[in-house]
Curated annotation (Swiss-Prot):
Record protein name field: Large ribosomal subunit protein uL18
Keyword tags: Ribonucleoprotein, Ribosomal protein, RNA-binding, rRNA-binding
Transmembrane segments: none
Taxonomic path: Bacteria, Bacillati, Actinomycetota, Actinomycetes, Mycobacteriales
Organism superkingdom: Bacteria
Source organism: Mycobacterium tuberculosis (strain ATCC 25177 / H37Ra)
UniProt record similarity statement: Belongs to the universal ribosomal protein uL18 family.
């Protein structure tokens, strides 16, 4: 039985993410910046993989991001700014970028560029 196009794309993304996760791991000094993108929102977390904790998180669901005028890319930029601010507050300046199997472009690239411009290095 043939799969739908959306199922095939989801499975391909999960395979890409699995390949990435074999190579990426976050530590307390350099946590993993994990991105999840849905059709409407974008979520990002700083994860310490050694003890399985989330150091900081930001999402487009938050009230100050929902009020951003513009499209989803503008909201992604604001989420990138927020995660950089929260990382600085937690004493983190370098991260490992985990794009979650998504292609590096559009909202993912906008979030990463905004985080870099606001002080995160990866």
């Amino acid at each position: 039985m043939a799969q739908s196009v959306s199922a095939t794309r989801r499975i391909s993304r999960l395979r890409r993410h699995t390949r990435l996760r074999k190579k990426l791991s976050g530590t307390a000094e350099r946590p993993r910046l994990v991105v999840h993108r849905s059709a409407r929102h974008i979520h990002v977390q700083l994860v310490n993989d050694l003890n399985g904790t989330t150091v900081a998180a930001a999402s487009s669901i938050e009230a100050d991001v929902r009020g951003v005028p513009g499209d989803k890319k503008a909201r992604s930029v604001r989420v990138g700014q927020l995660i950089a601010e929260r990382a600085k507050a937690a004493g983190i300046d370098t991260v490992v970028f985990d794009r979650g199997g998504y292609t590096y472009g559009g909202r993912i690239a906008a979030l990463a560029d905004a985080a870099r411009e606001n002080g995160l290095s990866f």
